């Protein structure tokens, strides 16, 4: 059949400004007439013609509720805009890191390469009819659209008058692998449904020594548990951990992708990954039995990770520092060295200490993976990470949850080369972390999240903190009045970043109070929630003395926490006596 293209009249819809990772709203908002269509067309209009006409696009996501409807709408709009091919992961499933890998690595049967992707995800936000949906666009390098593009998309949403769509194009069966071909006014249009794991698994096997990891997993001394929280990581977990690496099926937890993530919150932290946390011996009550040696979890779209040892939590800030410190010896991909390392500004300075010690280039960037992407494209950065459970490398242009798990497995395999056979005790996750602290010092670190705060009140709190910064002597008077047992503030500012690659400047990236002993308080408003504002407070204290690195984090940070809450007048502005989540 030859499909026809019709033009639908529309008008701008307020609030379609993409955040750090696309547009996220409640499903009911996306289901409003023209809501999704306006945003998709605004994106097409923001791209240059060669990225649309005759191009190959990837459309997939984490499988959350409304994805199946959204994919069909985007296919019809892509056809109408002159796109030549759309690649879809079977059942709309492709993890965010796998989308990046597909853009960068995959070639079609005719040699075609993808120029970009619509990723349907709200990441770690809940899914279901009353929960969140999201969409973001990734570029031909496999990374999220830069601000120059997202700003253009937003401007386009404010002026849009119409969009083309191939309404008579039948829905494509996305449950079966294969190619469906159509004829349109501009010639052929193909939709190819493919296995979501193939390209990604191939890439992982080129990075890590699967044989070494397989050997570790085959040891009766090594036990392992992976929790996909019913997100898209489940589409990869069986293939990688069971089929390729020989783990037991019983090692996989919640690995069936579900539209509503099984009613849970697909955010891999100590609050939401309750089942894994209990199994690893970190729950409030003892589950009985010996916990596994190693545990890990993913979020909805599998770009985030949480790393756990037996009764031991690894902070994301420590995780990226430990991966960087061990990458050259443990991971074949890095055997010839690291080009540089980078972290987001709120992430602890543990990575800075490793970079200094190993004489590596180091970068501190705003929150948002696109900033790392620029450094990687310029060959300046190999390993990077964020405190928000995101870790990755230059193999793709997104953070990558399964990559981080394989990196940790590689480090464990490397450290236990001589211990796998025989009676020798395995070097544990906790051993590796404590040894790291003994070598580099420890950054005590915690994050307080205040979710769904009244946006006006959140803004007032931030303005109060900026105003305080105008006089450091005055700030120190207030600080000493609150707590005499903390160091003095050395400097305070609003973080601003000048990209060393393209010279672009990002302002208002978080409020910082930097103390004379290396401690930090950071306050940020987050752009990833779908309702209200989220205030994130980051508290960090550096301890170089190896004999003092074994304290409980909350105990060590207690004076700084007290100071942060009183200095910011948190309860006064928000009405909250406690945070929603403590990490």
From Swiss-Prot:
The record's catalysed reaction(s) read: alpha-D-glucose 1-phosphate = alpha-D-glucose 6-phosphate; O-phospho-L-seryl-[protein] + alpha-D-glucose 1-phosphate = alpha-D-glucose 1,6-bisphosphate + L-seryl-[protein]; alpha-D-glucose 1,6-bisphosphate + L-seryl-[protein] = O-phospho-L-seryl-[protein] + alpha-D-glucose 6-phosphate
Q: Which UniProt keywords apply?
A: Carbohydrate metabolism, Cytoplasm, Glucose metabolism, Isomerase, Magnesium, Metal-binding, Phosphoprotein
Chief localization:
cytoplasm
Specify the domain of life of the species encoding this protein: Eukaryota
Q: Which InterPro entries match?
A: A-D-PHexomutase_a/b/a-I (IPR005844), A-D-PHexomutase_a/b/a-I/II/III (IPR016055), A-D-PHexomutase_a/b/a-II (IPR005845), A-D-PHexomutase_a/b/a-III (IPR005846), A-D-PHexomutase_C_sf (IPR036900), A-D-PHexomutase_CS (IPR016066), Alpha-D-phosphohexomutase_SF (IPR005841), PGM (IPR045244)
Q: Which residues carry this modification: Phosphoserine?
A: 123
UniProt key word Magnesium? yes
Report residues binding Mg(2+).
123, 299, 301, 303
Task: Extract the SUPFAM superfamilies matched here.
Answer: Phosphoglucomutase, C-terminal domain, Phosphoglucomutase, first 3 domains
The record's Gene Ontology biological-process terms are: carbohydrate metabolic process; glucose metabolic process; response to cadmium ion
Q: Which GO terms describe its cellular component?
A: cytoplasm; cytosol; nucleus; plasma membrane
Q: How is the cofactor bound?
A: Binds 1 Mg(2+) ion per subunit.
GO molecular function term, any single one: phosphoglucomutase activity
Record family assignment: Belongs to the phosphohexose mutase family.
Q: How does it assemble?
A: Monomer.
Q: What is this protein called?
A: Probable phosphoglucomutase, cytoplasmic 1
Source organism (scientific name):
Arabidopsis thaliana (Mouse-ear cress)
């Amino acid at each position: 059949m030859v499909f026809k293209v019709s033009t639908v009249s529309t008008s701008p819809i307020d609030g379609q400004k993409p955040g750090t990772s696309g547009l996220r709203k409640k499903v009911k908002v996306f289901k409003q007439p023209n809501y999704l269509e306006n945003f998709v067309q605004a994106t097409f209009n923001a791209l240059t013609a060669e990225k649309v006409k005759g191009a190959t696009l990837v459309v997939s996501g984490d499988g959350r509720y409304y994805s199946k409807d959204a994919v069909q709408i985007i296919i019809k709009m892509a056809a109408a805009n002159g796109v030549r091919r759309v690649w879809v992961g079977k059942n709309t499933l492709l993890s965010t890191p796998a989308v990046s890998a597909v853009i960068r690595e995959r070639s079609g049967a005719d040699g075609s390469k993808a120029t970009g992707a619509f990723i349907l995800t709200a990441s770690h936000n809940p899914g279901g009819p009353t929960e969140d949906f999201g969409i973001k666009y990734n570029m031909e390098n496999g990374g999220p659209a830069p601000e120059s593009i997202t700003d253009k998309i937003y401007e386009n949403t404010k002026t849009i008058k119409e969009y083309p769509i191939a309404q008579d194009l039948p829905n494509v069966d996305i449950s079966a692998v294969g190619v469906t071909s159509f004829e349109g006014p501009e010639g052929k249009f193909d939709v190819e449904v493919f296995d979501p794991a193939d390209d990604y698994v191939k890439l992982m096997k080129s990075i890590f020594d699967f044989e070494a990891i397989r050997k570790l997993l085959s040891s009766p001394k090594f036990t392992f548990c992976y929790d996909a929280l019913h997100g898209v990581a489940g589409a990869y977990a069986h293939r990688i951990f069971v089929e390729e690496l020989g783990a037991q099926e019983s090692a996989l937890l919640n690995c069936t992708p579900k539209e509503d993530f099984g009613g849970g919150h697909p955010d891999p932290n100590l609050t939401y990954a309750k089942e894994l946390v209990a199994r690893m011996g970190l729950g409030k009550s003892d589950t009985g039995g010996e916990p596994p040696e190693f545990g890990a979890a993913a979020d909805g779209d599998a770009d985030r990770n949480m790393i756990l040892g037996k009764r031991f939590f690894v902070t994301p800030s420590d995780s990226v520092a430990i991966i960087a410190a061990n990458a050259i010896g443990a991971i074949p991909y890095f055997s010839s060295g690291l080009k540089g390392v980078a972290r987001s500004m709120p992430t602890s300075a543990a990575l800075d200490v490793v970079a200094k010690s190993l004489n590596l280039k180091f970068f501190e960037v705003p929150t948002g993976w696109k900033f790392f992407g620029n450094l990687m494209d310029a060959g300046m950065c190999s390993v990077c990470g964020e405190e928000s459970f995101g870790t990755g490398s230059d193999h793709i242009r997104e953070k990558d949850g399964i990559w981080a798990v394989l990196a940790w497995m590689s480090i464990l395999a490397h450290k236990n080369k001589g211990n796998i056979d025989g009676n020798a005790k395995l070097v544990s996750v906790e051993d590796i972390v404590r040894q790291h602290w003994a070598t580099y010092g420890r950054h005590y670190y915690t994050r307080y999240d205040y979710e769904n705060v009244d946006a006006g009140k959140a803004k007032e709190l931030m303005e109060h903190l900026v105003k305080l910064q105008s006089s450091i002597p005055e700030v120190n008077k207030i600080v000493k009045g609150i707590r005499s047992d903390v160091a003095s503030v050395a400097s305070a500012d609003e973080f601003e970043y000048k990209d060393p690659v393209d010279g672009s400047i990002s302002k208002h990236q978080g409020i910082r109070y930097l103390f004379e002993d290396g401690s930090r308080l950071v306050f940020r408003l987050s752009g990833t929630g779908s309702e209200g504002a989220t205030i994130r407070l980051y508290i960090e204290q550096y301890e170089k003395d190896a004999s003092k690195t074994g304290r409980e984090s909350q105990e060590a940070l207690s004076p700084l926490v007290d100071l942060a809450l009183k200095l910011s007048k948190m309860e006064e502005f928000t009405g909250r006596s406690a945070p929603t989540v403590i990490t």
